[in-house]
């Protein structure tokens, strides 16, 4: 509003303009003084300006997906002491908010082949790295058709150990994600848990698991809770990357996914690791020091009226 008053004051005068806008002329002059003499502003106003820059930086550096809670936690990690309510207030003024998760779309096509038993029973618990992996895939709509993205996650630290993109839902693309994970981790005796999708219960996939010394496990048909951790990663991926823009082609999705996986594995704050990135938890990830129990990301209290807000 002040720039508008500055523009019209010569033509109409400050008094008449303030009268029409129901503002006291003293308010206008006070704002003018603060703009021209920033050092005369209150300590709180000056600190707010500085905090806004820091909040915007943290928000931009983390793919613009963080809500109040994670922005606040990141600021604390950097040694910036600030109250959570202050971050919430300033983010509201700046128009910044965490991304919202969308509804899940069914991609599982069950196959009538004999599937492995459920070795997990919804207990996503791991005492060491590579004790339990979960796998699933999701889809992305592009201008040139659908793209499918498969992930394999190590439950111990929530680390994405393998992923792959494809233009079709054939078994080969989930096999490629598995091969990447096997090459990266060299596991032995790992439980591999998935849904009963035709790709995961196919002869080729189950045979490769057996050759690699992995123990196959599948949840029940049509029940997302039986593979809840993998579903949660899919939800984060869709909310933090896919739902934020339209996509031209597979190459564009692949580059964005590569960037996100690197950020997710190394820099994204994780609540169950004490709001620290996995990169800072190398010892925790590599040593079987304690049992890790998977928990879904919780929404911020400030966004409690918007279920599914990713913080």
Model-inferred region functions:
Residues 1-281:
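Charged DNA-binding/catalytic regions of mobile-element recombinases
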Residues 279-283, 306-311:
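N-terminal, intrinsically disordered charge-dense segments
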Residues 286-287, 295:
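N-terminal amphipathic/hydrophobic targeting modules at extreme N-termini
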